[in-house]
Amino acid sequence: MQEKYHPQEIEQQARQSWQETGIFNTTEIPDKPKYYCLSMFPYPSGKLHMGHVRNYTIGDVLSRYRRMQGYNVMQPMGWDAFGLPAENAAIQKGVPPAKWTYDNIAYMRSQLQSLGLAIDWKRELATCDPEYYRWNQWLFLRMLEKGIAYQKTQVVNWDPVDQTVLANEQVIDGCGWRTGAVVEKREIPGYYLAITRYADELLAGLENLPGWPERVKAMQANWIGKSYGVDIIFSPDIASGMPQALKVFTTRADTLMGATYVAVAAEHPVALYAAQNQPKLAAFIESCRQGATMEAELALQEKKGMATGLYVLHPLTGERLPVWVANYVLMSYGEGAVMAVPAHDERDFDFARQYALPIRPVIKPEDGELPAPLAQAFTGYGVTFDSGEFSSLKSMDAVDAIATKLKLEEQGEKRVRYRLRDWGISRQRYWGCPIPLVHCDQCGVVPVPDDQLPVTLPEDLVPDGSGNPLTKTPSFYECTCPRCGQQAHRETDTMDTFVDSSWYFIRYACQDQQAAMTDQRANYWLPVDQYIGGIEHAILHLLYSRFWSKVMRDLGLVSFDEPFANLLTQGMVLNEIFFRKTGNGRIQYFNPVEVDVQYDAEGKKIGAVLQADGQPVESGGIGTMSKSKNNGIDPQEIIEQYGADTARLFMMFASPPTQTLEWSDAGVEGAFRFLKRLWRQVYLHRQQGSDMSATDAIPHLEYPADLRDLRCQLHQTIVKVTDDLERRHTFNTAIAAVMELMNKLAGVQDISPAARQLMQEALENSVLLLSPIVPHICHILWRELRPGTELLDQPWPQADEQALIQDEIEIVVQINGKLRGQIRIAREADQATIERIALEHEHVQRNIAGQPIRKVVIVPGRLVNIVV
């Protein structure tokens, strides 16, 4: 065994061994418990970042741990390879997105392999592979047959530069997130998936996911947004020219008698009708179309509106209520119209005060009165007043009574609504899965037959940035109609990339199946036992995946209801931010490796200078590693300098996995030093000559007392590390426990046969306990400790129950309740012996100083309190 730890050399040896044996390639073993561990697959952006390293190391630790416990473990890897970034990069570099993507995949695969991940690479997939996305297309056609997929025209956010639809989340201050162009609202036909059909099941299913973080479940429940309320119809005031009735949905029908106007969204048909002969209103509507699109943004922006001159009639009183166009009303919620009750809604209150509209209170607290005039809206529940026949009712009773009356008058009824909207999957981009439809002048929209799938993308196109290149590629869109044989053209929209990631975890189970989307292997492996990824995916990806799985279940393709049994959302990786403000008002960021931080004599940071010029830079504190802040650390540099095991150890030790991790160069150095100490400890043990193994262990009670204590600590460490990995997922405390044990081992000077045997047992078990976290070094050290055997053939260590029973225990000694020392006593010592030993303690003697002892209180196994 070489004396020095050379990580690059030993890591290459370990990986070569794993590759040659194919040890991580999995197959189905029906009589063995399975464990499917999956980290969210990466987008092939070109390089791994530290967030990737953390994510995939967490999954690898759990996979290796379960493997040692006897599970049949699958840990696959693939690439979320379609999407706008590839197209934009291709525009900048003048290369096809396919080439850019596949080159990135090749490089990032080598990076992942250098981390020593226990991945079954035979199952690798890329969503841009036609053999993968053909099944997107096949399932889309099945959904089309079931009415789950359908076409409709809807107002969308349109980026005029990228010439594509943007999700609400991609519109920032009215501008496209990438181009900065002012976003337009357009009515565009597109294809939608009826996720709302599954709204109740998606909501109820959250109750069956105890292994998910409560925060994620709450986010999904809020996104689904089930509301119990009342649909209310406000009839048109024909005399004002109002062309139609307005239907509104409200969860507060108890406030109906306080309605003083009705507000509609800028895209509402009534708004567009009223604007036909009102240029000012038309201009206002256009300005609303360029405003906020998210509820959170709408809540913060200034409330603006304009009267239409049209009126509706109050459904219970017949009062004429003006119709306003308001920028705080979303067309996507309810019917795009709200009944405005300024006294009991904050937005309506602000709007009414700004435009001098009536404010009519009709609810007061159960235990008091409302101030007059109102300084702010009273939004709570209470008791009705000034509400005619509905006065003096508690809010919920008033809701029931008013809903009953409205139904009787055919002016409304109780209704359940959802915030969730059907999923629009059409994208006017090139680098995505083609939608398998053909447009024929004779036959209309015709599905591509199954035997003509996949509809493949031309992979040699180089986008120029002027819209979707598929619309300018006759070799793609020109075709014959599958039904009548006449000239036709293909659909040129592609699918939202969330489609690709909504079922990839199923395809891993049967990646080589060419005749079907899935087979029986999916039901063996699924659901995923442990899914790992960032909380930023809490809503869209995780919700879409749950929906997709339920659709596949209903089509008989899989047998499970929920795709992910347990979910771990890892925290972000943080680093310091350094910058300078330039003369033109911009900010230039510098990577921390380019900066020297200055400290005072006490170690307090007092400044920082750029290495290149020695001039000061400002600190922006700690923030998430990102390209925009230039504060990322290249994992490859860490691996090349310290080895993959050091990177893995630091990532697992620096913070619990669900919390943020602050990057620390000193922490990386510390991890490297620990691995060198581990290597040296085994080296020194081997130098003393050893052909023993832990299987030759001496019975616990035959060890001398001091060695029994050490062996007790060893087996306590096994118990703790097992619990930390199994139940708590706190890898940092597991590592700390092994480090503490290693410190104890380093101090052992005894070279007796018993001590040598215990050292062998302790080192073997330490290597086994650490192997899921730092697999390369442990692989090599095991061969040194147990020549002729392989670590990956070993089971997880089991604690010796006899060793956990301590001969002596340590208890604290107090005087009048204040800690004065600790004593070691025999576990079975009687109270008289405990009292005698406590009173003989030197600190006790000094603190008593001859004072009379009133009594001695002994709490068995815990403490002695001497009262003086």
Curated annotation (Swiss-Prot):
It is an enzyme of class 6 (ligase). A motif ('HIGH' region) lies at residues 42-52. ATP binds at K627. Its main location: cytoplasm. A motif ('KMSKS' region) lies at residues 624-628. Keywords: Aminoacyl-tRNA synthetase, ATP-binding, Cytoplasm, Ligase, Nucleotide-binding, Protein biosynthesis. It is found in: Cytoplasm. It catalyses: tRNA(Leu) + L-leucine + ATP = L-leucyl-tRNA(Leu) + AMP + diphosphate. The keyword Nucleotide-binding applies. One of its GO terms (biological process) is leucyl-tRNA aminoacylation. GO terms for molecular function: aminoacyl-tRNA deacylase activity; ATP binding; leucine-tRNA ligase activity. Pfam families: Anticodon_1, tRNA-synt_1, tRNA-synt_1_2, tRNA-synt_1g. Its EC number is 6.1.1.4. One of its GO terms (cellular component) is cytosol. Belongs to the class-I aminoacyl-tRNA synthetase family. This is Leucine--tRNA ligase. It comes from Nitrosomonas eutropha (strain DSM 101675 / C91 / Nm57).
